[in-house]
C-alpha cells in the first residue's frame, strides 16, 4: 500500500494530486525550483525538496535529481503529473529501478505511445518524410509532450526551416526532447478525445468523450464532456479505437487518445500517456476521482468490469495570465486575489499574494461547472467567471466568458478554427463609462481622507485610466453635498464601494486598488499620473520586448551595423515555455542591439533598433 508520494511537477497539477493524497491519508512531498521556493504547491505539501536552479532544464526536467529527492524524502511512489517528464520512459524506468512505485503506465507503453511518431506507426500512420507544395498546410509537432509546445502550422515552404527550428527549441525546453515530425494539417476540425483507465488485470475503461476544440496556439482553452453533437455510432467508434490502442501496448493507468474529427471522419492524433489538464470534466460526469483511481491501480487493485454511468455535462475553462488581444502574450505580476462563487470547482496553482513569473506555464487555475444539461453547465460556468474576483495580472477571463456565450459555441458548432475567426470580436472591449467613473470616485474619496482639496471646488477634476490598452478620461466634481458627475446620481462613494444611479437604475461597483492597478468588479484598469511626466522618445524602428522573458537566441552574425530585411527574425524570446520571435519592422540597418542570449528582459525593454538606410 502506498503511504507517501512525491509529485514530480509543480503548480496546479501538483496541488490537485496532493489534495487527493491528503484525502487518502498519504504523505505528500513536493519538489520546487528556486523560482518556486514559495509557490503554492511547495507550501501545501507535507515536505519539499529543493531543485537548484530556475529554468525547467535545470530543475523539473532533471529526472536524476527528482529520483534522488524521492529517495531522500523516503517516499514509496512518484507521480509525474502532466508535462515535464510525465511521458518520459527513461524517467519512469529510473523511478522503478530505484525501487519506487511509478504511478503511471509501464515504460514500454510510454515508449510506444508517448512518442507521437511511434504511436502513429502503431496505428498504421506515417509522418511526412518530405514536404512539397502539394502537402501544404502541414503541422510541425513535437514527438514528446503536449500542451501546444513545439507546434507550428506551416503554409509556405519557405517557412518550414524556421518552423522546424523553433519547434525543436521549444520542445527541448519544455520536455527535454527536441524531436519533431511533420504531418498534414487538417483545417477546422473538432478536437475530440477519449479518456481511458486500465488496470493490471486486463480491464480497460473508456470514460466517454471530451471536446477540446477551443484552442489557442494549439493549447486547449475550454474543454467539455461529453463531446456534443457526435452521433452515437461515432462516439462508440472513438471509444472502441481508444480501448484497442490501450490494449495494443498493455496499457496501465489513465491515458487519453486524441482524434481530429472532420466531415464525420476521425483522424488519430496521438495518445497522451498521462493525466490530462482537462480530466476534471470527466471526473464530474462519471463521479470519479481519477487521481485516486491512479493510486489504486498502482497498488494493484482491479477495476470493476464496467465503468460507472455518465451523468450530466461538465465544462472547464483555463484561466491564464495572458493578454489575448496582444497576441496571447504572457503576463506577470502579483496575484492579489482569486476567488470564485460557490457551486463550481476551482483547481488553482496559485493563491492570493503569489508572484506570477516568466519561467513556467501562465495557467493560474481551472474552473469547472457540472449540471444536468450542456446549456445549464455552460451558463453556470460563464456566470461564475463573471462573478469571480481576479485581482492581478491581465487574464483571459473576459475572453472565456464571451467564448462560452458565443452562438457558435452554445450551438455546439465550434471547431479548432474558432479563435482564428472570432478573436478580434471577442477581445473588443467597449468601455463602461460608469465603471471608469466609479474608479475615479473611489480614488477621490481616498484622497479626500488625506486632506486633498481645491481652491476652486466647482471646477471638474480629471482622472485618466487605460482599459484594454486604450486611454480614457473621467470628469467629476466636489460639491457641498459630496462627489458628483454629469448624467449620474452618486448614491454612495468610498474607497472600496461606489453606488451610482443612472436613469433610475442603481449599480454597485466594488473597487480595489493596488498601486496604479485598479479593479472595478471584473474590469482591470491602470491609473495614469494626474500630471504626466515627459518620457524619453524611442527612436523610430525600436524593437521593444512584448512581454517579460529570456533572450534565448540572437540571429546568427547579427551585430550593430548589420543590414536586415523587413520580417527577418532578429531576436528570440522565451516566456512561460513558449518562444516568441521578434522580427525587423523594416528593411534597413541595425543601429543598436541592446541584449545578449540568456539575458532577462522586462515588458517594454528596448531590444534593438532598425533604421532605414
Where are each of the predicted segments found?
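Catalytic P-loop NTP-binding/switch module of NTPases
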Residues: 506-546
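N-terminal beta-alpha lobe that positions the nucleotide/phosphoryl donor
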Residues: 1-257, 261-278
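Residue-level recognition of beta-strand microenvironments
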Residues: 185, 349, 370, 493, ...
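Short acidic-glycine loop/turn motifs at beta-strand connectors
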Residues: 156, 198-203, 261-264, 371, ...
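Short, well-ordered beta-strand elements within core beta-sheets of diverse protein domains
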Residues: 151-153, 184, 230, 363-372, ...
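Structured functional modules or segments
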Residues: 534-613
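Short amphipathic alpha-helical segments
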Residues: 149-150, 223-226, 361-367, 541
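Catalytic cores of soluble metabolic enzymes centered on carboxylation/carboxyl-transfer
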Residues: 242, 280-283, 288-486, 566-569, ...
Amino acid at each position: 500500500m502506498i503511504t507517501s508520494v512525491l509529485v514530480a511537477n509543480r503548480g496546479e497539477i501538483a496541488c490537485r494530486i496532493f489534495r487527493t493524497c491528503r484525502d487518502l491519508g498519504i504523505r505528500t512531498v513536493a519538489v520546487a525550483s528556486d523560482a518556486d521556493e514559495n509557490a503554492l504547491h511547495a507550501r501545501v505539501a507535507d515536505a519539499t525538496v529543493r531543485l537548484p536552479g530556475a529554468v525547467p532544464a535545470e530543475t523539473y526536467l532533471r529526472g536524476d535529481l527528482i529520483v534522488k529527492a524521492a529517495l531522500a524524502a523516503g517516499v514509496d511512489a512518484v507521480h509525474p503529473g502532466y508535462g515535464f517528464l510525465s511521458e518520459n520512459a527513461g524517467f519512469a524506468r529510473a523511478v522503478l529501478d530505484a525501487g519506487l512505485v511509478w504511478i503511471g503506465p509501464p515504460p514500454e507503453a510510454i515508449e510506444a505511445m508517448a512518442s507521437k511518431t511511434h504511436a502513429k506507426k502503431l496505428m498504421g500512420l506515417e509522418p511526412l518524410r518530405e514536404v512539397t507544395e502539394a502537402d501544404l498546410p502541414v503541422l510541425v509537432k513535437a514527438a514528446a509532450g503536449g500542451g501546444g509546445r513545439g507546434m507550428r502550422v506551416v503554409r509556405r515552404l519557405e517557412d518550414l526551416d524556421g518552423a522546424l527550428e523553433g519547434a525543436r527549441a521549444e520542445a527541448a525546453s519544455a520536455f527535454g526532447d527536441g524531436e519533431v515530425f511533420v504531418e498534414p494539417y487538417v483545417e477546422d476540425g473538432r478536437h475530440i478525445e477519449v479518456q481511458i483507465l486500465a488496470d493490471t488485470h486486463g480491464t480497460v475503461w473508456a470514460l466517454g468523450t471530451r471536446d477540446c476544440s477551443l484552442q489557442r496556439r494549439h493549447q486547449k482553452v475550454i474543454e467539455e464532456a461529453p463531446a456534443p453533437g457526435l452521433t452515437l455510432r461515432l462516439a462508440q467508434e472513438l471509444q472502441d479505437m481508444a480501448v484497442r490502442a490501450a490494449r495494443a501496448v498493455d496499457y496501465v493507468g489513465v491515458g487519453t487518445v486524441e482524434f481530429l474529427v472532420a466531415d464525420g471522419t476521425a483522424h488519430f492524433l496521438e495518445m497522451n500517456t498521462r493525466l490530462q489538464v482537462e480530466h476534471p470534466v470527466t471526473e464530474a460526469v462519471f463521479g470519479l476521482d481519477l487521481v485516486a483511481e491512479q493510486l489504486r491501480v498502482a497498488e494493484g487493485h482491479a477495476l470493476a468490469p464496467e465503468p460507472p454511468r455518465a451523468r450530466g455535462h461538465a465544462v472547464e475553462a483555463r484561466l491564464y495570465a495572458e493578454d489575448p488581444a496582444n497576441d496571447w502574450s504572457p503576463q506577470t505580476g502579483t496575484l492579489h486575489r482569486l476567488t470564485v462563487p460557490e457551486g463550481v470547482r476551482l483547481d488553482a496553482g496559485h493563491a492570493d499574494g503569489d508572484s506570477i513569473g516568466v519561467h513556467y506555464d501562465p495557467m493560474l487555475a481551472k474552473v469547472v461547472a457540472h449540471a444536468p444539461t450542456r446549456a445549464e453547465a455552460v451558463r453556470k460556468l460563464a456566470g461564475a467567471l463573471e462573478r469571480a474576483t481576479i485581482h492581478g495580472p491581465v487574464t483571459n477571463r473576459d475572453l472565456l466568458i464571451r467564448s462560452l456565450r458565443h452562438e457558435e459555441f452554445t450551438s455546439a458548432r465550434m471547431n479548432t478554427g474558432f479563435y482564428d475567426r472570432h478573436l478580434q470580436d471577442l477581445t473588443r472591449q467597449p468601455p463602461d463609462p460608469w465603471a471608469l467613473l466609479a474608479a475615479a470616485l473611489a480614488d477621490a474619496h481616498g484622497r479626500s481622507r488625506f486632506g486633498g482639496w481645491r481652491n476652486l471646488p466647482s471646477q471638474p477634476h480629471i482622472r485618466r485610466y487605460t482599459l484594454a490598452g486604450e486611454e480614457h478620461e473621467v470628469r467629476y466634481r466636489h460639491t457641498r453635498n459630496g462627489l458628483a458627475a454629469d448624467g449620474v446620481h452618486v448614491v454612495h462613494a468610498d474607497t472600496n464601494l461606489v453606488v451610482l444611479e443612472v436613469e433610475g437604475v442603481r449599480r454597485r461597483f466594488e473597487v480595489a486598488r493596488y498601486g496604479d492597478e485598479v479593479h472595478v468588479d471584473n474590469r482591470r484598469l491602470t491609473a495614469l499620473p494626474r500630471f504626466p511626466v515627459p518620457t524619453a522618445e524611442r527612436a523610430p524602428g525600436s524593437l521593444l520586448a512584448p512581454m517579460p522573458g529570456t533572450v534565448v537566441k540572437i540571429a546568427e552574425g547579427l551585430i550593430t551595423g548589420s543590414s536586415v530585411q523587413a520580417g527577418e527574425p532578429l531576436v528570440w524570446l522565451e516566456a512561460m515555455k513558449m518562444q516568441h520571435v521578434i522580427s525587423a519592422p523594416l528593411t534597413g540597418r541595425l543601429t543598436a542591439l541592446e541584449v545578449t542570449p540568456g539575458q532577462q528582459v522586462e515588458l517594454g525593454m528596448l531590444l534593438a533598433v532598425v533604421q532605414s538606410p
